[in-house]
Swiss-Prot record:
Name of the gene: murC
The protein's name in its UniProt record: UDP-N-acetylmuramate--L-alanine ligase
EC numbers: 6.3.2.8
Entry GO CC: cytoplasm
Keyword Transmembrane applies: no
InterPro entries per UniProt: Mur-like_cat_sf, Mur_ligase_C, Mur_ligase_C_dom_sf, Mur_ligase_cen, Mur_ligase_N, MurCDEF_pg_biosynth, UDP-N-AcMur_Ala_ligase_MurC
Primary localisation category: cytoplasm
Biological-process GO terms, alphabetical: cell division; cell wall organization; peptidoglycan biosynthetic process; regulation of cell shape
Subcellular location: Cytoplasm
Pathway noted in the entry: Cell wall biogenesis; peptidoglycan biosynthesis
Annotated source species: Escherichia coli O6:K15:H31 (strain 536 / UPEC)
Residues annotated to bind ATP: 126-132
Homology family: Belongs to the MurCDEF family.
HAMAP family: MurC
Amino acid sequence: MNTQQLAKLRSIVPEMRRVRHIHFVGIGGAGMGGIAEVLANEGYQISGSDLAPNPVTQQLMNLGATIYFNHRPENVRDASVVVVSSAISADNPEIVAAHEARIPVIRRAEMLAELMRFRHGIAIAGTHGKTTTTAMVSSIYAEAGLDPTFVNGGLVKAAGVHARLGHGRYLIAEADESDASFLHLQPMVAIVTNIEADHMDTYQGDFENLKQTFINFLHNLPFYGRAVMCVDDPVIRELLPRVGRQTTTYGFSEDADVRVEDYQQIGPQGHFTLLRQDKEPMHVTLNAPGRHNALNAAAAVAVATEEGIDDEAILRALESFQGTGRRFDFLGEFPLEPVNGKSGTAMLVDDYGHHPTEVDATIKAARAGWPDKNLVMLFQPHRFTRTRDLYDDFANVLTQVDTLLMLEVYPAGEAPIPGADSRSLCRTIRGRGKIDPILVPDPAQVAEMLAPVLTGNDLILVQGAGNIGKIARSLAEIKLKPQTPEEEQHD
């Protein structure tokens, strides 16, 4: 660390000046990697470990970080602090070694809280829409010339990174409720997009516990802070009297402080009007499809309006919004082999949504923007517990597509649960008589099993949170065409 870097570091986070070397266990995750990237740009020595390289680790290596693709005790040698992902178990050899060496071990949200401590923090929480809303707020603040720091759970496509160190006073961050670690954050402004039952193992299966945790998060706001909340969500509407802070509501509801009306989707863009108190109506063109994204934009506009950002900057940012990685991510439109003598094309869209509400929103956006397309979904359930807990909801939502192909459940470290597997879910959906799902037992067979169901006027949604994003990219690389054994060997 040179003198100039150290001076910059001290000016931004003076109380951390004794920290030199920060080690991340599970550094390849988007949330972990984003924080590591900001700290690397602040001048800290960064190291980290994960099981395999990915774009996040490559970006960090480009910034000078040392990355180990293993978990060994010696990796934490000389670290001032060890930051651990919630996916890492307590018996990880690096965690054990850190404790034995009396090196502090903290969760990622604690480090994010330290970054936020010396800035004007804007935290975006909620079951769905956090990543996109974080990107929208960041885009608006950047367009307004405020040069924010942001830390997002997904790739901000306009910036090409998950996180960026700005020189302005704002830090805009996605706040993760999955392990309740967002309670470490103390922002000035908090957005809550919605609250549904998810990650219930963290909350002992008690929805009241989850709701109270969100209230506790909002009570971390100072008394002069502001909560921005979607009043369309019934749980948020129920909780509003308990917030105890200044609030701004948004939604399609007539009593929303920032109200969406006259929504219309044309292809990938949403067009709508935002009505705000004591402001002229704002006529928005949003470069993101779906009513759910109009709500995300309304949240971002509510925050920006409160900050006094010019309407023109807001409108420019939303119209040019490039989205986030794996959120209705358009990967291309590819020509197909002639079907019944007629040639055609198929659009390929990759989406991270893995909760029934998210899948439903993606399907509705696809139907609204491309109503004449044959809608084909390749779905990978994520976690056996989620599949079990939301089984009927998944079965109901997935019947809305024209053709469904389903991969095996991505376990995310969980043991199988009888009846919460893809074969059972396919059987249940088939029994409802609307569609006949196709189980894909081997990901290598996806292109081969996809080809016969395409009509030449298709929109393919690749949906899920496991390793299905890699499958989507491989489909784009081969332009949806099944590979011969010779081609596979050549690849």
